[in-house]
Amino acid sequence: NQPGPPGPPGPPGSAGEPGPGGRPGFPGTPGMQGPQGERGLPGEXGERGLPGPPGPQGESRTGPPGSTGSRGPPGPPGRPGDSGIR
């Protein structure tokens, strides 16, 4: 008795299950800095200050006495005397 011929090949197998997901990617680089903001508005004006205190009272001082005046010029010559003869 001889063995018969081999049978036909079987059907292909079913698709396998999907593999596990990959690892998460690296974090991205930070973005560039934004442009500079606009200049702010000027501040409001301050209030006017209070008036200052009054100044100290001045001192009254008497001046020194004046210097002695210079000597006056000599007087005019006297009148001539009466003659004793009458």
From Swiss-Prot:
<feature type="modified residue" description="Hydroxyproline">
    <location>
        <position position="12"/>
    </location>
</feature>
<comment type="function">
    <text>Type XII collagen interacts with type I collagen-containing fibrils, the COL1 domain could be associated with the surface of the fibrils, and the COL2 and NC3 domains may be localized in the perifibrillar matrix.</text>
</comment>
<feature type="compositionally biased region" description="Gly residues">
    <location>
        <begin position="16"/>
        <end position="25"/>
    </location>
</feature>
<feature type="modified residue" description="Hydroxyproline">
    <location>
        <position position="24"/>
    </location>
</feature>
<keyword id="KW-0130">Cell adhesion</keyword>
<feature type="modified residue" description="Hydroxyproline">
    <location>
        <position position="27"/>
    </location>
</feature>
<dbReference type="GO" id="GO:0005581">
    <property type="term" value="C:collagen trimer"/>
</dbReference>
<feature type="modified residue" description="Hydroxyproline">
    <location>
        <position position="6"/>
    </location>
</feature>
<feature type="compositionally biased region" description="Pro residues">
    <location>
        <begin position="1"/>
        <end position="12"/>
    </location>
</feature>
<feature type="compositionally biased region" description="Low complexity">
    <location>
        <begin position="35"/>
        <end position="50"/>
    </location>
</feature>
<feature type="modified residue" description="Hydroxyproline">
    <location>
        <position position="80"/>
    </location>
</feature>
<feature type="modified residue" description="Hydroxyproline">
    <location>
        <position position="51"/>
    </location>
</feature>
<dbReference type="GO" id="GO:0007155">
    <property type="term" value="P:cell adhesion"/>
</dbReference>
<keyword id="KW-0677">Repeat</keyword>
<feature type="modified residue" description="Hydroxyproline">
    <location>
        <position position="74"/>
    </location>
</feature>
<feature type="modified residue" description="Hydroxyproline">
    <location>
        <position position="30"/>
    </location>
</feature>
<feature type="compositionally biased region" description="Low complexity">
    <location>
        <begin position="57"/>
        <end position="71"/>
    </location>
</feature>
<feature type="region of interest" description="Disordered">
    <location>
        <begin position="1"/>
        <end position="86"/>
    </location>
</feature>
<comment type="subunit">
    <text>Trimer of identical chains each containing 190 kDa of non-triple-helical sequences.</text>
</comment>
<feature type="modified residue" description="Hydroxyproline">
    <location>
        <position position="77"/>
    </location>
</feature>
<dbReference type="InterPro" id="IPR050149">
    <property type="entry name" value="Collagen_superfamily"/>
</dbReference>
<comment type="similarity">
    <text>Belongs to the fibril-associated collagens with interrupted helices (FACIT) family.</text>
</comment>
<dbReference type="GO" id="GO:0005576">
    <property type="term" value="C:extracellular region"/>
</dbReference>
<dbReference type="Pfam" id="PF01391">
    <property type="entry name" value="Collagen"/>
</dbReference>
<keyword id="KW-0176">Collagen</keyword>
<keyword id="KW-0379">Hydroxylation</keyword>
<keyword id="KW-1015">Disulfide bond</keyword>
<protein>
    <recommendedName>
        <fullName>Collagen alpha-1(XII) chain</fullName>
    </recommendedName>
</protein>
<feature type="modified residue" description="Hydroxyproline">
    <location>
        <position position="42"/>
    </location>
</feature>
<feature type="modified residue" description="Hydroxyproline">
    <location>
        <position position="54"/>
    </location>
</feature>
<keyword id="KW-0964">Secreted</keyword>
<feature type="modified residue" description="Hydroxyproline">
    <location>
        <position position="65"/>
    </location>
</feature>
<feature type="modified residue" description="Hydroxyproline">
    <location>
        <position position="18"/>
    </location>
</feature>
<dbReference type="InterPro" id="IPR008160">
    <property type="entry name" value="Collagen"/>
</dbReference>
<feature type="modified residue" description="Hydroxyproline">
    <location>
        <position position="9"/>
    </location>
</feature>
<keyword id="KW-0272">Extracellular matrix</keyword>
